[in-house]
Amino acid sequence: MRVGLYPGTFDPVTNGHLDIIGRAVKLVDKLVIGVAINIGKGPLFSLEERVEILERETAHLKKIAEIEVRPFDSLLMHFARDVNAQMIVRGLRAVADFEYEFQMTAMNQQLDREIETVFLMADPRHQAIASRLVKEIATLGGDIGKFVPPGVAQQLLAKVGKG
């Protein structure tokens, strides 16, 4: 069984994340979406909310491949081994992403050479989307409808007191 791991904080999940997930499920038999606890980033959504949102927003993809949404707070490569992943899936939006991901991949290869990293280029419609910016736009009362699914927009606007 080909198992891929798509890790992230997903605070909130965006249309860009969902595009990568929708393409990644076509490459594997099972995709584990690893939700990083990452308290250092001070997430707006709780871990439970992020897991629930991802389960809801990816439910329609389960007919393509098995999908499992799991939180993790360990080293990524340890988590990848725990879920028997042969590959880590990462999305690239811009050159800055590539530089960071290149460095992370080099370090991860030192930790486990058996686990490959696969990069998927962001769809041009989603290249500018970043969770941090979506939260900022929502907080300032802007329209986030192009950046996140309707259910996520509703939850985010409620969180920032605009819904």
UniProtKB/Swiss-Prot annotation:
Q: Which cysteines are joined by disulfide bonds?
A: none
One GO cellular component term noted in the UniProt record for this chain: cytoplasm
Q: Which domain of life is it from?
A: Bacteria
User: At which positions is ATP bound?
Assistant: 9-10, 17, 91-93, 101, 126-132
Look up the record and name the cofactor or cofactors this protein needs: Mg(2+)
Enzyme's top EC category: transferase
Where found in the cell? Cytoplasm
Q: Name one GO molecular function term.
A: pantetheine-phosphate adenylyltransferase activity
Site description Transition state stabilizer, residues in chain: 17
Q: What is its EC number?
A: 2.7.7.3
Q: Which GO terms describe its biological process?
A: coenzyme A biosynthetic process
Annotated residues that bind substrate are located at: 9, 41, 76, 90
Q: Which reaction does it catalyse?
A: (R)-4'-phosphopantetheine + ATP + H(+) = 3'-dephospho-CoA + diphosphate
The pathway it acts in is: Cofactor biosynthesis; coenzyme A biosynthesis; CoA from (R)-pantothenate: step 4/5
What are the protein's UniProt keywords?
Answer: ATP-binding, Coenzyme A biosynthesis, Cytoplasm, Magnesium, Nucleotide-binding, Nucleotidyltransferase, Transferase
What does the subunit comment say?
Homohexamer.
The record's annotation in HAMAP family points to: PPAT_bact (MF_00151)
Functionally, this protein is described as follows: Reversibly transfers an adenylyl group from ATP to 4'-phosphopantetheine, yielding dephospho-CoA (dPCoA) and pyrophosphate.
Q: Which family does it belong to?
A: Belongs to the bacterial CoaD family.
What's this protein's name? Phosphopantetheine adenylyltransferase
